Amino acid sequence: MLKGKDLLSIHELSRDEVEEILSLAQELKEKQKAGIPHRLLEGKSLGMIFEKSSTRTRVSFEVGMYQLGGQALFLSSRDLQLGRGEPIKDTARVLSRYLDGIMIRTYGHERIEELAEWADVPVINALSDLLHPCQALTDLLTIREYKGKNLTGLKMAYVGDGNNMTHSLMYAAAKVGMNFAAATPEGYEPNAEVVANAKADAAATGATVTITHNPMEAVVGADVIVTDTWASMGQEAEHDARTAVFRPYQVNWELVAESGDARCLVMHCLPAYRGEEIAEDVFEEFADVIFDEAENRLHVQKAIMALTMGN
């Protein structure tokens, strides 16, 4: 279903395509653990454009391509003419002559959309300021591992900044029939257009999307609580001001207890700033879940690459 397609936003995927990614990711994870070769991208090359640095993204994509039998090329803005003013459309057309796929991690989402418009090979959004689809799909896989494959009717609560993770988690939950609630401070709400799109997606699967300023209200009945850093990359100058505003949104035991579910999971996409968005003792209690989540980025991204770039 996904062969030759871009993956820019979960909103653009069908429910079947989301399920296809998750199922293949689980299969590839099991094969990797069992030492069974799965060189689905033998002879293929992925270009990795990094305008925004990352530990997990680079390592997981690079290792993933190696395990699939292909190769990954790291391209920082210093390595590309993009950094010297070459139009994105020219870079896209040139790289399409050399590569079988392009992954990009950048700031403005419009840069990814323009790259995809002009590229003749699949483009994968590895993060923009608006969306983080690979991580949100990873979170779905992790929840499936702990809660079972049928996610319909479960509730995901997000507490913190209305950022790219909020947006992509909202889309992901809606696509698989999970109810979603986000709690953010006033002035830090998620993008209104994304919320409207997610509500439309949720209506199609019988789910709900709720936005509130009350973190205790958001987590009631939650099967999983997700949080993220209060100041994303590029917002370092706002750290102190944001910390003051977000302090009531820390994921601590008092908040987790409000879920009313002793089996409620806590997840974090990392890096985590313990004592800020998540209490140290809560992080350590759910460390196995959080690091399973980190590992699953590898398997989900392998599935995305295999489905979009493979034969």
Language-model-derived ranges and their functions:
Residues 1-59, 63:
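Positively charged, low-complexity intrinsically disordered leader regions
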Residues 35, 39-144, 274:
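Phosphate/diphosphate ligand-binding glycine-rich loop within oxidoreductases
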Residues 51-63, 146-227:
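Glycine-rich phosphate/diphosphate-binding loop of Rossmann-like nucleotide-binding domains
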Residues 78-79, 127-131, 185-188, 294-297:
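Short, acidic/turn-prone active-site loops that include or flank metal/cofactor-
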Residues 113-128, 237-258, 285-287:
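A short, gly/pro- and small-residue-rich
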Residues 200-280:
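Rossmann-like adenosine-cofactor binding region
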Residues 263-311:
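Adenosine-phosphate binding glycine-rich loop
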